[in-house]
């Protein structure tokens, strides 16, 4: 689950997550994707670049 907002500046980032994932899977450069999505601040960029889905791994333990 991607956070709704950037932890540092509060900008909404969850709206671009799916497009980012699709374009990254298609082989596009992450820098170009983030630039075109309007994520200029490094705090917002790191939210997408460093995110790892762990929900599926934790689901069996609920």
Swiss-Prot record:
Entry's family note: Belongs to the archaeal Rpo10/eukaryotic RPB10 RNA polymerase subunit family.
Pfam families: RNA_pol_N
Domain of life: Archaea
Biological process (GO), any one: DNA-templated transcription
GO molecular function: DNA binding; DNA-directed RNA polymerase activity; zinc ion binding
Protein name: DNA-directed RNA polymerase subunit Rpo10
GO cellular component: cytoplasm; DNA-directed RNA polymerase complex
PROSITE patterns assigned to the protein according to its UniProt record, in alphabetical order: RNA_POL_N_8KD (PS01112)
Recorded catalytic activity of this chain's protein: RNA(n) + a ribonucleoside 5'-triphosphate = RNA(n+1) + diphosphate
Species the sequence originates in: Methanocorpusculum labreanum (strain ATCC 43576 / DSM 4855 / Z)
Function: DNA-dependent RNA polymerase (RNAP) catalyzes the transcription of DNA into RNA using the four ribonucleoside triphosphates as substrates.
InterPro entries for the chain: RNA_pol_su_RPB10, RNA_pol_suN_Zn-BS, RPABC5/Rpb10
Localisation: Cytoplasm
Subunit structure: Part of the RNA polymerase complex.
Residues annotated as binding Zn(2+): 6, 9, 43-44
EC identifiers of the protein: 2.7.7.6
Cofactor(s) listed: Zn(2+)
Keywords: Cytoplasm, DNA-directed RNA polymerase, Metal-binding, Nucleotidyltransferase, Transcription, Transferase, Zinc
Textual note on the cofactor: Binds 1 zinc ion.
């Amino acid at each position: 689950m991607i956070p709704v907002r950037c932890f540092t500046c509060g900008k909404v980032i969850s709206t671009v997550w799916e497009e980012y994932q699709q374009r990254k899977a298609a082989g596009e450069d992450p820098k170009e994707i983030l630039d075109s999505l309007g994520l200029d601040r490094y705090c917002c960029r790191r939210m997408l670049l460093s995110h790892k889905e762990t929900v599926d791994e934790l689901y069996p333990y609920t």
